[in-house]
Structure formats: structure tokens, C-alpha cells
A protein has these predicted regions:
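Bacterial N-terminal signal peptides that target proteins for export
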Residues: 1-8
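Feature marking well-ordered beta-strand scaffolds used for ligand recognition
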Residues: 21-465
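N-terminal signal peptide c-region/cleavage motif recognized by signal peptidases
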Residues: 15-16
């Protein structure tokens, strides 16, 4: 990682003052002492999900009180596991599924998962990534009907989304309840755009040629490596402008699009500048005024941006963050969930980290819990032939994080150690209205649509009947 992205590291040094990263002169915890957590973060359960060196990629929690299910993406194990966490101190695996003939497959496997609801039925989409020359190189996602949980006999595969034009599968995805009533599935692909699928068409048995309804171009490709694709994105409703907006991390920078008509996206503005190579994750605040971004290389902090001038149409590009945050300047934070003013971070070797943006100019750490307990810089890299292990990578440990809005339960997936469940003192759930914000987050209201959106003129689909 260091050698490949040395030039990007130099670029970050040039903007260190602007992002106000943790002072490298500050005392940091020795790597062999990263155990346990802060007094306000309580570990409820830990499940070692697999026997091998690599356990999980992402994690997803259902949000309805009557459905206490957590989905763990099995990464290079090529499987998905579903846990009943009705008693969060004693998770119970109720279902697992592995790709057929796993021994014939090569790749990073089961990466990202999203649950969604259409009509009265619940579904789960598991994304996959397999190498060319092996089975299912064109497979993007497997869709399960999970309405009948916790009975495993009632879980059924109902569709598979394939994209043979660009083999390699879907690295990241986002399920979104659009303001027009449709449930859409945004997916990364090895091309210069994100794909947009109509999930009702996918699960209802419609002709597969009708599933794909739109593409969101990537205006910020990673030119140094010839990479045109998005890495990740967030989609949310802007209650002030009555627009559905797409926030894309395009590896060479970030972009915001109006996807109110997903068949014809309109670019609004970009974030580009020094130190933004490998632009990885882009998450706005509920009102779209601020955003948290991640760039995927060692020593870089999460950056905080004021998006106001871009959202108001005063500029086409923003190039200077207003602050930054890091758990440990020697490492790298990964994915994050915003529940304003809190940001919940899956911080690779630094486990679960929680900071707040009560003052966006001065982010403050609120709690942590170390989950990796791993050897520093022996993270993910290489190929299947060397067990995917590197001696220069910090990409190991906490991979994904999710927050259950109705009660504040925190789920975290760790690449090395498996599934973890937590609670934080004083955080008993989240509703944007309680903090003076729209009730907008990555959590979707599949029954009513986005907070603040007019009722759609047409009824949404009913799913598979």
C-alpha cells in the first residue's frame, strides 16, 4: 500500500494544515495494547463467524422492531450468514448460504449486503465479486426473499443480477426508497458509471432486460491507475430542494448528482483537489450541508466538508475541507455511518470508533472499542495464492458498521475476528427530528418513503407474490 500510493501520500502532506489531522507528535497507544474499549462503549456479543484468517466484509441490520436480523457478508468465504439478535447478548445464526461450487471460484467474494422491502415482503441482496476465468465472474448480486425468517426453510433465492459487459461483480451497493415510490438498487461496476436497478422488476420476475433503468456517470475517475469506476456512494433525499441526490466516491474525487429522475441523472457539483486519490466513501449529513469522506490509503484522516456552496449552486467544485479526524495517524479508518451529530466508524485496525460533529470545525472522539487485535501492517493484499495477506497493508480489522435507528444497537464486522454488537451510553436510538434535522440517514422508510417527500402519484410495486 505504501509503495503503490507514495505520490498520494505526498499530496496529503500538502493539505495537512487544512484538514487538522491528529498531531503525529501526540501519544498514541502501542499496537500490542489495542484491546478493550472506552468505558461508555459496551460490547454485547462477539461471534467468530469463520475458521480461516479472513472472516467478514460488510454487515447489514434490518430496522423494523419486529425483525431482529443481522446479515454478515462472508468475504473470501463466499457466503452470507443471517443472525437473530432479538437477544443481542446471544446472537443466533438462523441461516447461511454459500455460492454453489465455492472451490471453483476465485475472488474477494461476498462483499456488500442490503436488505429492502417491497409491499409486504422483505428481501436481501448480497453482492459478489469473482475474478474473470472463474465461475460467476459476471455475477453482481444474489437476491433472497427473507420474509419468512427466522424459519430457514422459507428463505429463497429469487433472482441473480448479472452484468456480463464488465465482469468483476458489484463491490458496493445501496438500496434506496426513491421519492417516486420505487425501490432502487445502485451498484458499482468496472465501468465509468454506477448502475441503477428497479428492484420491484428484479424480484417480481420481470424480463431481466428491463431491470437496469439508469446509469450515473463518474466525472472523477482515478486517472493515474486508469480506473473509471465508482468505489462507493450514498443516496438520500434533500428535503429542502425536494431532490433525490446521489453522493459518489469516484476514486479520483467525489461528485453529487440529482437522481430525482434516475433514468437521466444531472450533475450538481464535485469535490476534487490534492490528496483525494482513492476517494472511497462519501456520506452527507441529514440536511446535506456537511459530509464525511474517506480516502483509502494509510495515514490519511477522514475529512469533513461544508457542502453549502455546491448545494446552493454557487460553485461547481469544492476543494478544501473544513476539518478532519483520525483514530490513530499511523493507520486508516474505513467505512462510516452518520447519525448526526455522531459518526460511527469501522476503523480497520482501530476497531469501532465514534466521534461527533457538534462543532464540525473540531470533531471530538466519543468512544471506541478495539476489535482487530491483529499484527500491525499485516492486512489484506496480494492474491488468493498467498492467502490475501500483505506485510505493508493496514486494511484489516473493522470493515463495516451499521446502526439500528429505533434503539441504537451497533453492529460491526471485522475482517479478522467476525461479528460484534455494541451499545454506547446515552445513545438509545436516532431520529433526525430530535436533533433539528430531517429524519434522513442510510436507513430507508420502505413503507412511507423519504422524510419530507410528497406522496408519489403512483403506487410502489408489490414485490414477488
Amino acid at each position: 500500500m505504501r509503495g503503490s500510493f507514495a505520490l498520494a501520500g505526498i499530496a496529503v502532506l500538502g493539505c495537512a494544515a487544512a484538514v487538522a489531522a491528529q498531531d503525529p507528535g501526540m501519544s498514541v497507544r502501542p499496537f500490542d495494547m489495542k484491546h478493550g474499549g472506552s468505558p461508555n462503549v459496551h460490547m454485547l456479543a462477539h461471534v467468530v463467524t469463520h475458521k480461516g484468517a479472513w472472516k467478514l466484509a460488510d454487515v447489514e441490520m434490518e430496522q423494523d422492531p419486529g425483525r431482529p436480523y443481522v446479515y454478515a457478508c462472508g468475504f473470501t468465504n463466499f457466503d452470507v450468514q443471517i443472525y437473530d439478535v432479538k437477544d443481542p447478548s446471544h446472537p443466533k445464526m438462523v441461516y447461511s448460504w454459500t455460492i454453489e461450487n465455492p472451490e471453483l471460484h476465485r475472488g474477494i467474494g461476498a462483499m456488500d449486503g442490503k436488505y429492502f422491502k417491497i409491499g409486504s415482503r422483505y428481501y436481501y441482496a448480497q453482492s459478489y465479486q469473482f475474478m474473470q476465468g472463474t465461475p460467476d465472474a459476471d455475477l453482481g448480486a444474489v437476491i433472497f426473499d427473507v420474509t419468512g425468517l427466522p424459519d430457514p426453510s422459507k428463505v429463497k433465492v429469487v433472482a441473480r443480477i448479472r452484468y456480463p459487459k464488465a465482469p468483476g461483480g458489484f463491490h458496493n451497493t445501496f438500496a434506496y426508497k426513491h421519492s417516486d415510490g420505487r425501490v432502487l438498487y445502485f451498484a458499482t461496476v468496472n465501468e465509468g458509471h454506477a448502475l441503477v436497478y428497479d428492484l420491484d422488476k428484479v424480484v417480481s420476475g420481470a424480463d431481466s432486460s428491463t431491470w437496469l433503468i439508469g446509469e450515473v456517470p463518474n466525472p472523477t475517475p482515478f486517472k493515474a491507475f486508469g480506473t473509471a469506476s465508482y468505489h462507493d456512494f450514498y443516496v438520500g433525499y434533500d428535503a429542502a430542494t425536494h431532490q433525490d441526490k446521489f453522493y459518489g466516491a469516484g476514486l479520483g474525487g467525489y461528485s453529487v448528482w440529482d437522481v430525482t429522475k434516475p433514468e437521466a441523472p444531472k450533475q450538481l457539483f464535485t469535490i476534487t483537489g490534492l490528496g483525494l486519490d482513492i476517494a472511497h466513501t462519501f456520506t452527507p449529513s441529514p440536511d446535506g450541508k456537511y459530509a464525511v469522506t474517506e480516502t483509502e490509503y494509510q495515514y490519511t484522516p477522514l475529512k469533513i466538508w461544508d457542502l453549502t456552496d455546491g448545494q446552493d449552486g454557487k460553485t461547481q467544485n469544492i476543494d478544501t475541507p473544513i476539518s478532519g479526524w483520525t483514530a490513530d495517524w499511523r493507520d486508516l479508518s474505513h467505512n462510516h455511518e452518520v447519525r448526526w451529530p455522531y459518526v460511527f466508524v469501522s476503523a480497520y485496525e482501530d476497531g469501532l470508533q465514534i466521534f461527533d460533529l457538534k462543532n464540525p470545525l473540531a470533531p471530538k472522539t466519543d468512544g471506541h472499542y478495539y476489535t482487530c487485535e491483529c499484527t500491525h501492517e499485516h492486512g489484506f493484499g496480494g492474491t488468493p495464492d498467498n492467502g490475501w495477506e500483505s506485510t505493508i497493508s493496514v486494511e484489516q480489522g473493522a470493515f463495516g458498521v451499521d446502526v439500528r435507528n429505533y434503539d441504537g444497537l451497533i453492529a460491526l464486522s471485522d475482517m479478522r475476528t467476525g461479528l460484534w454488537l455494541f451499545r454506547m451510553d446515552g445513545f438509545k436510538g436516532w431520529n433526525g427530528h430530535a436533533v433539528g434535522m430531517p429524519n434522513i440517514s442510510s436507513v430507508q422508510d420502505y413503507d412511507h418513503g423519504p422524510d419530507g417527500a410528497p406522496k408519489p402519484a403512483t403506487s410502489p410495486g408489490m414485490g414477488r407474490q
